[in-house]
């Protein structure tokens, strides 16, 4: 049995982390899997496999220190792969990607497959140290991979057009979801008895919850707005809710490891994100038969929903456009029902069995 090294920063909460946890049970049937982490947080149930820690760092580590440590971690990673006899590396997230690619420069000969789950030119659009370093490292290192697996067409196009990556080195591997598990968890009860609109995501600027709240405030509706997630903007959003006199209508319920029970019971799902790689939450909302109002963000929104075929797209960072989208979904019962009826059909394209089959094809070369 071939040895597969899956290298990711941690298995804490996050989209790439959830994809790894979803694929692990199937990949473990075909490979002897070695999970290589840089942080000991594991938030998901995973099958029995060998776990190795390259280091135990903190996400809040100084960015300059992170950069300076890369070559030393690459040498350590090269030695670990050699000692374990790894045949193929499957690497997720930027920092592990850089380390594995530097290890390739230092002589690591194993087959190297990396995942790209963001749109780098959007993710690193600011003119600061972090963005400049990341763009430089992507341009320098990514061409050294044997195969790059962006999780959307938009992310693939970004690598080709903005980082001069050869399209011959790239194949799309969409995010995997566990439809059966989602369906089971969606059956759980919730304490909330009122009808509601739902949004799920970290409380940060990228998710743009403030715009969603302001757009919702203009609706004439008895529906609550429920937001699941934690983040640095919680106090700021609570202040906005108070300013708009919405304390009884907008509910910040924090993180819930089972958002599906809310998705299955909401009137519709609203998502105001400024950018995404390819959002797990949106796929999961479709798996729960949600009608969706979503910003036409880069990348993946239009790829997932089509031209309003599976969800209603609105302009990014445009309060009036979001308001009109919410209003349309609220008032057009026929449209809302039509989206609900075909949502799960769209979600089936991302079921773990299909995506794992694609992953195995790429990993086995």
Swiss-Prot record:
It is a peripheral membrane protein. Keywords: Cell inner membrane, Cell membrane, Glycosyltransferase, Membrane, Transferase. InterPro entries: Glyco_trans_1, Glyco_trans_4-like_N. The keyword Zinc does not apply. GO terms for biological process: lipopolysaccharide biosynthetic process; protein N-linked glycosylation via asparagine. Disulfide bonds: none annotated. It catalyses: N-acetyl-alpha-D-galactosaminyl-(1->3)-N,N'-diacetyl-alpha-D-bacillosaminyl-tri-trans,hepta-cis-undecaprenyl diphosphate + UDP-N-acetyl-alpha-D-galactosamine = N-acetyl-alpha-D-galactosaminyl-(1->4)-N-acetyl-alpha-D-galactosaminyl-(1->3)-N,N'-diacetyl-alpha-D-bacillosaminyl-tri-trans,heptacis-undecaprenyl diphosphate + UDP + H(+). Its EC number is 2.4.1.291. It is an enzyme of class 2 (transferase). One of its GO terms (molecular function) is hexosyltransferase activity. The keyword ATP-binding does not apply. Pathway: Protein modification; protein glycosylation. It is found in: Cell inner membrane. Adds a GalNAc residue on to the Und-PP-Bac2,4diNAc-GalNAc disaccharide in the N-linked protein glycosylation pathway. Transfers the third sugar in the heptasaccharide biosynthesis. This is N-acetylgalactosamine-N,N'-diacetylbacillosaminyl-diphospho-undecaprenol 4-alpha-N-acetylgalactosaminyltransferase. It comes from Campylobacter jejuni subsp. jejuni serotype O:2 (strain ATCC 700819 / NCTC 11168). The gene is pglJ.
